[in-house]
Curated annotation (Swiss-Prot):
InterPro entries: Ribosomal_bL12, Ribosomal_bL12_C, Ribosomal_bL12_C/ClpS-like, Ribosomal_bL12_oligo, Ribosomal_bL12_oligo_N_sf. It holds the Pfam family Ribosomal_L12. GO terms for molecular function: mRNA binding; structural constituent of ribosome. The gene is rplL. It comes from the Bacteria. Belongs to the bacterial ribosomal protein bL12 family. It comes from Cronobacter sakazakii (strain ATCC BAA-894) (Enterobacter sakazakii). The keyword Membrane does not apply. The keyword Ribonucleoprotein applies. Keywords: Ribonucleoprotein, Ribosomal protein. This is Large ribosomal subunit protein bL12. Forms part of the ribosomal stalk which helps the ribosome interact with GTP-bound translation factors. Is thus essential for accurate translation. GO terms for cellular component: cytosolic large ribosomal subunit.
């Protein structure tokens, strides 16, 4: 019996952010590919016709000099535990939040930059 796409999607949606990061790393090793390359190819696709973007992704590019403050800010923003937040900060660049409003994304970016992190909103 094989697993369906819906079952895989359901299993991944129940995972924590850190589990998904580990899954992606394992898949990159197993298949000899890079998820970053897939994102670059997808971004190079045809642009949407002047439609204003309503959902944004907040990407932690680098922790900066004050990693402890950044970990605290990540914990506050995501609700992750200490270990998960630390692992996420150390695995930068990493997506912190996806599909958030522009106001929420900008507020999160501001709080993380005040803690010393390098953040990008896409």
């Amino acid at each position: 019996m094989s697993i369906t796409k819906d079952q895989i999607i359901e299993a991944v949606s129940a995972m924590s952010v850190m589990d998904v990061v580990e899954l992606i790393s394992a898949m990159e090793e197993k298949f000899g590919v890079s998820a970053a390359a897939a994102v670059a190819v997808a971004a190079a696709g045809p642009a949407e016709a002047a439609e204003e973007k309503t959902e944004f992704d907040v990407i932690l590019k680098a922790a900066g000099a004050n990693k402890v403050a950044v970990i605290k800010a990540v914990r506050g923003a995501t609700g992750l535990g200490l270990k998960e937040a630390k692992d996420l900060v150390e695995s930068a660049p990493a997506a912190l939040k996806e599909g958030v409003s522009k106001d929420d994304a900008e507020a999160l970016k501001k709080s993380l930059e005040e803690a010393g992190a390098e953040v990008e909103v896409k």
